[in-house]
From Swiss-Prot:
Phenotypic consequence of K151N: Strongly reduced release of EIF6 from pre-60S ribosome subunits
One GO process term, biological-process aspect: bone marrow development
Main location: cytoplasm
Top-rank taxon: Eukaryota
Name under which the protein is recorded: Ribosome maturation protein SBDS
Outcome of mutating E44G: In SDS1; uncertain significance
């Protein structure tokens, strides 16, 4: 699809339109194809690599630019770059049925790949294959959302799959080195955030090796920094606690 803008008659090609309805009116932006998903997933961070122009339209294909008063009424501002960001993040990508089908298939597989990479069978600590996760996603009738990143959706899928199969996020293995004086007291505060304590060593400092849920990492890191006033340290030994070997659950 090619369009002309009425103000400067610059020809825009390879256009992907993102649309949002707000305050009873339609607003559109012109993006480069294949860049919208990259922006939403966080891979692409340069707005100029995504937007063909920072203008907001009511109809991209006709080159009709939105009126300033309509932008203020709908978005509370006439800052077109900021409005473009809102539409880019939350709007609906206008694509053909064939393009949409291809996009959904790719996102479905990407989500399954993330889940397979992050999760294991909790009983065996063995990872699952992407094919098995895809099959499980179809069994729960998971519907891909194009306005959410694949990472966000992978976390949703994990929650839903837990109700149907033995699956959990692979634990992270950490080492804490804490001042002895604060160590024992801090250990009690850390306990609810720790899955398994593998070893403890009391010497001049308290050293603990443990497994945690990855979702607790930030809270643990902040707690150690706060309680030890920067004297304690945290080291990631393994991002994923997975059994050695090539065997995967099919």
């Amino acid at each position: 699809m090619s369009i002309f803008t009425p103000t400067n008659q610059i020809r825009l090609t390879n256009v992907a339109v993102v649309r949002m309805k707000r305050a009873g009116k339609r607003f559109e932006i012109a993006c480069y194809k294949n860049k919208v998903v990259g922006w939403r997933s966080g891979v692409e961070k340069d707005l100029d690599e995504v937007l063909q122009t920072h203008s907001v339209f009511v109809n991209v294909s006709k080159g009709q630019v939105a009126k300033k008063e309509d932008l203020i009424s709908a978005f509370g501002t006439d800052d077109q770059t900021e409005i473009c960001k809102q539409i880019l993040t939350k709007g609906e990508v206008q694509v053909s049925d064939k393009e949409r089908h291809t996009q959904l298939e790719q996102m479905f597989r990407d989500i399954a790949t993330i889940v397979a990479d992050k999760c294991v069978n909790p009983e065996t600590k063995r990872p699952y294959t992407v094919i098995l996760i895809e099959r499980a996603m179809k069994d729960i009738h998971y519907s891909v959302k194009t306005n959410k990143s694949t990472k966000q959706q992978a976390l949703e899928v994990i929650k839903q799959l837990k109700e149907k199969m033995k699956i959990e996020r692979a634990h992270m293995r950490l080492r804490f080195i804490l001042p002895v004086n604060e160590g024992k007291k801090l250990k009690e505060k850390l306990k609810p955030l720790i899955k398994v304590i593998e070893s403890e060593d009391y010497g001049q400092q308290l050293e603990i090796v443990c497994l945690i849920d990855p979702g607790c990492f930030r809270e643990i890191d902040e707690l150690i920094k706060k309680e030890t006033k920067g004297k304690g340290s945290l080291e990631v030994l393994n991002l994923k606690d997975v059994e050695e070997g090539d065997e995967k659950f099919e």
